[in-house]
Amino acid sequence: MPSTYSDDNTLRSGLDRFRDHSPSQHRRSMSQETDSTVSTTSIVFDRIQERLDTKEFPARGTDGDDNDSLKDELNNDDLETGPFLGNASPSSRSNQRSSADGQRMDRSLRRWLFIVSGALVATWVIGLIFFVSSKAYKPSSSFAHDPQATVTHGSGKKVTLDQVLNNEWRAKSHSISWIAGVNGEDGLLLEKEGANKDYLVVEDVRAQNPSSVEASKSKTLIKDKLFEFANKTYWPTVTVPSRDLKKVLLATDVQNNWRHSYYAVYWIFDVETQQAEPLVPYDADARLQLASWSPTSDAIVYTRDNNMFLRKLDSDKIVQITRDGSADVFNGVPDWVYEEEVLASGVATWWSEDGNYVAFLRTNETGVPEYPIQYFVSRPSGEEPKPGEENYPEVRQIKYPKAGAHNPIVDLKFYDVKRGDVFSVDISGRFADDDRLITEVIWAGKQVLIKETNRVSDVMRVVLVDVGSRTGKAVRTVDVNDIDGGWFEISHKTKFIPADPANGRPDDGYVDTIIHNNGDHLAYFTPLDNPNPIMLTSGDYEVVDAPSAVDLQRNLVYFVSTKESSIQRHVYQVKLTGEDMTPVTDTSKEGYYAISFSTGAGYALVSYQGPNIPWQKVISTPSNPDKYEHVVEENKDLAEAAKKHELPINIYGTINVDGVELNYIERRPPHFDKNKKYPVLFQQYSGPVSQTVKKTFAVDFQSFVAAGLGYICVTVDGRGTGFIGRKNRVIIRGNLGTWESHDQIAAAKHWAQKDYIDEDRLAIWGWSYGGYMTLKTLEQDAGQTFKYGMAVAPVTDWRFYDSIYTERYMRTPQTNPEGYESAAVTNVTALSQNVRFLLMHGVADDNVHMQNSLTLLDALDQRSVENYDVQVFPDSDHGIYFHNANRIVFDKLTNWLVNAFNGEWLKIANAQPNGMKRRALPTA
């Protein structure tokens, strides 16, 4: 869905995909983590401490509730009472002078006062010495970051917007490119541009363990960063080794297409000769949409101009697999909506493990209506305009199925490499062409598991195809209306479990996430056609984007879960029998973890993301007898910065709305004073299955609002969001905007009753779905609670958004017209009851079209509603980055909010002309 200023403080170019993101996962970053896409073995192996001293960053304090008791604090001015809003009234200070100021004081009285004053000073000094020596007080700079402090002392530096926008508060993090060894060795990874090393090297983590006798030696794949061909020099952007590590597929001249996809020139690099040749023989400039290795390392399949081709490495001959590719027919790559909402990838090609078959999607979007994206300043196509058309905008027509419109027709095809033919397998009971979504394809030996749903995502079928016999059958059919009336979320984490009778697995199977116990849980289906699983997890919690990995040697499944808390993430392991579920991470302490496993699941990169300063380390998994641990990242610079700055006071808790416990975080100014009245900015995303309240380390825009501007910033995850049970999630089905806005209004009323809140200065803001929810909340509230709002790139009518995302939650406009009408932002009279609101949108937004904002503006015009401001950004997509636009967005948000809380918008509501100054007449 719309990209959002997301829960992980990341700004992405698409509505957040609604698991932990918006409809289309969050992308670009103002995030607190930065992924180094380059493999990080150099960091793992070069001069790294043996252990990470996490005691340096202990978690202290407890979760706050609504009536937390606060210690008295230093009353340093925040911007709440400082230069933005003016200081305290002079009447609060004495402005009277004694009438005896000019009189002389009796000498003995002065002597007596001097003695008493000296005694008092001496007493104060002695007390101060005792106070300091007892360590009852420390300046803020002497503490490591405490994310759960309820008070802050000291006078450190202020958090600035520039720091946030320049990513100075972003935690460093790294990704590891795990690969399997030629003979299946575990623990190998790719290292690119390591210190004092060749450009691309295969390393073995076990080499750093003196007790390991199985460690492989380093292997150089590419010596130099640059390579030459036909007297031209090239620099690879993408490097993908073959499974046998004898060749490397390189991509140069990469040009982005949509969120995930790109065009590039591809090369085959020979490791032995260190020479490259074009993937397409005799055409070194061929721009391809996709290229991928055969698992047997002897062939590459690629897509060019929407047709698929095969090149076997033992010859220059190219085999054309499909011939019907066109502007409307895609082979092996997805169209816009499948890339954005289904696959979350630019890849729709899947090799069988034996290299004998290629499965691929054929997408026909002939019947899908087009939407024009206009570029007024740039020309993303790279093409020069035709003579006489230099002053016209470039227009890109994209096939974009809006809710209720024709969807692309998608079929799964198979290419038999040995026979050289393409075939499909018809299975009885399949969904009709315009009612079918193919959401996941998993090779299971010589068979294929295919997940498909109807277009509104409430009926799912799992189909099993035997490519040898070219037959198939449905092995599972689930109607979610029989469970809770919700929907199926798309997952790409299903794991094939091959049979291993000697290891207790007599049949093939697979591990999948299913609906169970009011949430998402792991299930093991074996044999492949068995619809009745072994439950691996169950209980009042959920698994997250699971499974993470499977250790086939030890029959273990690894996964991330909310078992400890809905706003924490810990890693666990469980046997394929469903027994012995144990934590991998330390559950005795609060934590939010992510994890990346080696190909055999014997090693992992553990990423601690909060609430303390983030860190990373590579470990051996608990069942691996070859024990190993190395720190990758400690973020010492970030820890030092946290010591030297006044960060907001983060209070976590829950509020009860209609009997449902909703998570919140309240960010307070560093010198919070319970005797003051603070304005409040509510920030939310609120999209289905999203989560914004998390126990992660973050110094983001919301932190700046609290620590830099001195306001309170609150986030509440209402109903419809994730990880508080499906019952509270699926209530929004067919009625987007109703319950989410209700919960935001209820939360605002809850805060308005607090003694330290200024109930007349409440604002709400959000991006993407959060922008929609801002407008919907202002509409539903009609100025009763919220006075101000700031909406960026909002949906205003779900009939304008893409079919696959929207219909999952709303069904179709044809079957739910009342729901769509109710969900749209149409009551502009109610919007006029707010003091003022701000609307911003990127003109070239291919995700949430500017049509949404323009339609709302027209409705405002028709009703003569004028209490709003508008900013548009030429050539910016959903992330709003083009030509410095992102900085302007946050500058505008900041200044607009300060003016709102300063009362400036009240002054212009009924603007009146000032009296005219009398012109001075010239004197004679």
UniProtKB/Swiss-Prot annotation:
Residues 1-111 are cytoplasmic. It is found in: Vacuole membrane. The keyword Glycoprotein applies. GO terms for cellular component: fungal-type vacuole membrane; plasma membrane. It is a single-pass type II membrane protein. Its EC number is 3.4.14.5. This is Probable dipeptidyl-aminopeptidase B. It comes from Neurospora crassa (strain ATCC 24698 / 74-OR23-1A / CBS 708.71 / DSM 1257 / FGSC 987). The gene is dapB.
